[in-house]
Design a protein with these regions (language model features):
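Surface-exposed coil loops of outer-membrane beta-barrel proteins
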Residues: 66-90, 99-194, 199, 203, ...
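Short, catalytically relevant binding-site loops at active-site mouths
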Residues: 189-190, 226-228, 260-264, 319
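Long, well-ordered mid-to-C-terminal structural blocks that present hydrophobic/aromatic surfaces
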Residues: 232-277
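Beta-barrel outer-membrane channel/assembly domains of diderm bacteria
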Residues: 1-111, 134-146, 196-197, 203-230, ...
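Conserved active-site beta-strand-loop modules that form the wall/rim of enzyme catalytic pockets
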Residues: 180, 254, 311
Length: 374
């Protein structure tokens, strides 16, 4: 709508086609092939007296190959590709900005906190996760963003709902030129999966700063403590840390990191049930649930752009949280390009090489994707 957005509002359109293949050496499962097309169609009203509303419909449909287990179609003999044929009200919220430096948003909404490690929308899957919730964002203090919220229900990536009582606080202070210091508290009380109920308290400092005119240092340090909460009958305590160091220079980004989720036995491990898990610990999704002995992920990433084409490679070495038991290694590769503001293409590949000491098997994943949005 351009300049008429303030008068008439905005229509949001997002169409995404994807072919995905999941092929493992698991003898009891056949290779999964999924050809799907996802549509999101929404309308954002003009702002009136500080109020604004948004409604968004989302649907995902098979478009060709459909030999896969979507977790909803009953095809349990195939590998899981969690993109079911469903349609849903993805977002439906009302916001108010009439208070100074404050926005209050109520309803079904997308929530992405920090890097999505604890609360995110799982945006990689065709149908994202959204939350029936209240979110208050305040920026009254200099360089500070305070987010306080309460989640009553999560609409999952397979279009089911999980009732919960989840208050959260996320406070971030930006040190200009150096990075952002964030402290957080997430209290998840999950009615559907009580073993996923936990309370997490943590902090992070992340940023980048110039070293020379052509080189920037990249860094992140994060620590969190987690224990059981409310309906979880398993009494446990576990720690989490994530350290990244790297540099950007001459159009190339290089990073190395170690991420560790503590664990000691079944149901006594650090878990992040509302995270965008695909963004962490390898794209083959071997560790969306933390193993009983915890997880240590030592990884390295290299990325650049060539004529507007982004190229990325990532290597992971997985072990238990002591480093004494090897789970396997993974190589991930991505090529993607945006064409103007509205079009995009992507190809992605992941190969997980399981260690014989783990209960995993070798797995290959492959994706081709095309997107159109405005």
């Amino acid at each position: 709508f351009g300049q008429d957005d303030a008068k008439y509002g905005q229509i949001k359109f997002d169409l995404r086609y994807r072919f995905e293949q999941d092929d493992s050496k698991l003898a009891t499962k056949d290779k999964g092939d999924a050809s799907t097309i996802r549509l999101r169609l929404g309308y954002l009203t003009p702002e009136v007296l500080g109020f604004q509303a948004y409604a968004e419909y989302e649907t995902n449909q098979d478009f060709g190959a459909n030999t896969y287990n979507s977790k909803r179609n009953g095809k349990v003999g195939y590998e899981v590709i969690a993109d079911p044929q469903e349609h849903e009200l993805n977002q439906f919220w009302l916001s108010y900005k009439g208070l100074a430096d404050t926005e209050v948003k109520v309803g079904r909404q997308r929530i992405k906190l920090d890097n999505d490690r604890f609360i995110g929308n799982v945006g990689w899957r065709q149908m994202e996760m959204t939350y029936d919730s209240v979110l208050v964002t305040n920026q009254s203090l200099p360089n500070t963003t305070i987010k306080v919220g309460y989640i009553n229900q999560a609409q999952t990536i397979i279009s089911t709902v999980q009732a919960m009582q989840t208050p959260f606080v996320n406070i971030a202070y930006n040190f200009e030129g150096y990075g952002k210091l964030t402290g957080y508290s997430y209290l998840i009380d999950n009615n559907e999966n009580p073993n996923q109920s936990n309370q997490t308290y943590g902090f992070s400092f992340a940023g980048k700063t110039p070293v020379t005119d052509d080189v920037k240092a990249i860094y992140r340090f994060e620590y969190a403590y987690q224990k059981d909460y409310e309906q979880n009958v398993n009494q446990y305590e576990a720690d989490y840390f994530h350290v990244i160091g790297g540099a950007e220079a001459y159009g190339v980004t290089a990073k190395a990191g170690i991420e560790q989720l503590g664990g000691s036995s079944e149901n006594n491990v650090f878990q992040t049930p509302l995270a965008t898990g695909h963004a962490f610990n390898g794209w083959s999704d071997q560790f969306l649930t933390t193993p009983d002995d915890g997880l240590r992920d030592v990884y390295a990433l290299l990325s650049t752009k060539v004529h507007g084409v982004k190229i990325m490679g990532v290597y992971h070495d997985f072990a238990d949280d002591t480093g004494s038991m090897d789970y396997g290694k993974e190589w991930d590769f991505l090529v993607t390009k945006k064409f103007g503001k509205h079009y995009s293409l992507l190809a992605k590949y992941a190969y997980f090489d399981a260690d014989t000491a783990s209960n995993k098997v070798d797995t290959q994943n492959f994706w081709l994707q095309a997107g159109l949005s405005f």
